[in-house]
């Protein structure tokens, strides 16, 4: 019991985080080398791990196929955050207006009574209330202009409302980005916002890069942009992909010649590029001149009279 009390006083164990440390540890003397320091750290770390294991075995466990499982208690040590605390977002225009007028947000029901069909329908989504397809008649108003299609005007007004909402959303994101409260998973391409707050602001996209991106987007359809409707003033993409023509798998008439021609074209391109490496012109000229000299010397030897081997050479008078 005394040893357990001593270890509890020496070590502080947080089983919830599987953390143990000794706040009173002191080196008896300064380590003279790195190896001695590592040895001391491993010795002390082994004691701390053993203390955590002793605490775990004191908790009740349940047996499973993978082995005993222990329910850990809640942690007692507060670990520091890796990221800073999220900054509050600036209020949007609607939130400022609602706060000024005292408008409180209330939860709306998902199902609403539709007077056109006399039944309950969803507020949003498929088969919703006040759907444009379910409106057979639109009552005329005194302010309506003659000759204007009310159904087309209804769709046009809806597009304008959606565009205005999108514009307000982008402005809210810009304001949040200026305040440093934009979420890291949101990226606004219109303002070139970075993906993470820790990254530097990206450079402005140049004209060539925009052209490359537009060309990739134009050729990303199933037909490679061939049958797509062109916008007014749209230029053809600069970098158009080339389709590689493969030879047929099943051998037929003329396939051998086509394959031979294709191989010869590849070899001719390789040889033309590296012809200066394959043929040494100076060395070839020297070899040609040497062979020519040898041929000349061989012809002159044939014209000379042959010596009589049987005759002995005459001794010169001393």
Swiss-Prot record:
Biased composition (Basic and acidic residues): 151-169, 226-237, 298-311
Domain of life (superkingdom): Eukaryota
Pfam families: RRS1
GO BP: any one term: ribosome biogenesis
Alphabetical UniProt keywords: Nucleus, Ribosome biogenesis
GO CC terms, sorted: nucleolus
Region listing for Disordered, in residue ranges: 59-92, 139-170, 217-259, 289-318
Subcellular location: Nucleus
Family statement drawn from the similarity comment of this UniProt entry: Belongs to the RRS1 family.
Family matches, as PANTHER family: RIBOSOME BIOGENESIS REGULATORY PROTEIN (PTHR17602), RIBOSOME BIOGENESIS REGULATORY PROTEIN HOMOLOG (PTHR17602:SF4)
Role: Involved in ribosome biogenesis.
Protein name (record): Ribosome biogenesis regulatory protein homolog
